[in-house]
Amino acid sequence: IRNPSNSNLYGDWIKNVQGDVSFVTEFGFDWIPPPECSLVITHDTYRPESCAAIFNCIKKNVPVLILSDGILEYRNSWIQKHRVDSGIFNPILGHKLACIGASQVRFLESIKGYFGKCENVGLPRLDDFKIESSKSKIPSILVCSSKTPWFSDDDKNQILQSFIDLKEIACNYGQNHTVKFNWRISDHIASVIGVETSIRKSLKEDLQSSTAVISMPSTVMLEAMYTSMPVALLDYTLSPHYVQAAWTVSCKEQILSTINELFNPPIAKLFFQRTALADALQIKESASARMVRLVSKMVEISYRSRSLGKPLRFPHRIIGM
């Protein structure tokens, strides 16, 4: 069951799943899976209708696999008022959650009652994510906001100030250096600081013309790191970070030195970034292959439980870390 706007989560890997696959995009509170259903897969745990459908599956003893669609972000997880009480995996509604990396597994399983709920899969859509090196001779920093930059008035003021400061220093820097700053930010932020946003372009297109990235906490960080681009984290809110970066900007005074280093990154910080990426994103093997293996094992375990008339239980780790 899925929201069609997030169809990139259900990419080529779904074609490699054995058996018949049906997509359900319209459903209400009373939706239940058909009797022949072996597994329900969804990322949609943010709406009352989809949460009710998941609960119906659990009651019917139908296994449910939840897909994580990106990084955890502290304010989104713990401060935002969500439409449903469960918010962001609080609790994890399904039998298993396909996490994007080892650190996400650790953070979530540190919460009481979550141990054994998480599997380290990765992000299948990044399996073949490659960009061509920029052909431009002019170094360029891509500046990114998250899709929903703030969740309160305090947040809004701090985040707008961070982009106001960054725009000011970027303009001054550009007067003395042959560099470019591209802004992949929300329309509101773009209007406040007086720049054009590339938010409607594909991320791949923006990254192909970039040398480095400055981003709010966002999955964009991992996508840029995955291409070996130096990435700085912009966050004036001083929130805990579930994904680490080698460069962090938490006040105006840190911006200039960070820009200088992004254009000439120290090797030690690049090593740190590579290690942080490997912890935040499963990249040891194909995420698509791990997802298919997880799905197959869950179906197999479910079938065996039904055949033996036993309660549905899954091992703490199905595919290993």
Can you say where each PLM-predicted feature lies in the sequence?
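Active-site regions of enzymes building and remodeling cell-envelope glycoconjugates
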Residues: 16-22, 37-38, 62, 115-118, ...
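C-terminal amphipathic helix plus adjacent low-complexity
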Residues: 264-321
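Active-site and donor-binding regions of nucleotide-sugar-utilizing enzymes
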Residues: 1-128
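Short, polar loop motifs at secondary-structure junctions
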Residues: 27-29, 102-105, 183-188, 217-221, ...
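Donor nucleotide-activated moiety binding/catalytic core segment of transferases
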Residues: 32, 183-227
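Catalytic binding pocket for nucleotide-activated donors in carbohydrate/polymer assembly enzymes
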Residues: 112-115, 190-194, 219-283
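Conserved catalytic-core segment of nucleotide-activated headgroup transferases in glycan assembly
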Residues: 10, 125-188
